[in-house]
Amino acid sequence: MPSTYLSLCNQVLRRLNEVEIIEGDFASVLGVQALVKDAVKASVAKINQAEFEWPFNAAEETDTLVVGQEEYTWPSFYKIADFNSFQIQEDTALGVSFTTLKYIERDEWYKKHRDNDYASGADGISVPRYIFPSHGNGYGVSPSPDKAYTLKFRYYQNYSDITAASDVTRIPDSYDTVLVDGALYHLYMFKDNLEASQASFMAFERGIKDLQTLYINNYEYIRDTRVKY
């Protein structure tokens, strides 16, 4: 269970031997307490930016396709999608079974499919078979859907701002110490304490590497890529 914004701030304040924040005063604090709030935000943002595919940022989206519409926007806080996961859901009423979409480049859609999709107008063509990155902030399907099919896919979320005392970070609470080290680094930088900030930065970087080792650098098999001559 991730820790709340208030809990993280108070952990940092205890490390500094400063007065903790009362929840009712959280929105209006000043001085060092306000600096700690900013430092915790910066620490959370840095961890989220360190990797595209943190497992704790994994999410799943369900969209209902619109007849005759090929392109759609990403959900809020979207970072990166798993294009292998896009699947039309089975629906006996629509006469469709589970269908995994094949990824194509946007240029391929432009060259081979867009004209037919656009020519179909508001009627669409059939069950989509392809998925592609749209121009801008979204994705596209082809052929143009002729019914309101349900599409599911998996993606990773970006950093979402924390503002209220009860907001949570999505980062597991077992790594609160990493967040605290990051907050101390930013706090000491605010205060121009270079020696203390450097020590906290090193601890913060080690903590991020530990997170990467645990969650990212985890291979189930190794493939030999040597070429035989």
Where do the language-model regions lie?
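Glycine-enriched, solvent-exposed interface loops adjoining structured elements
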Residues: 1-229
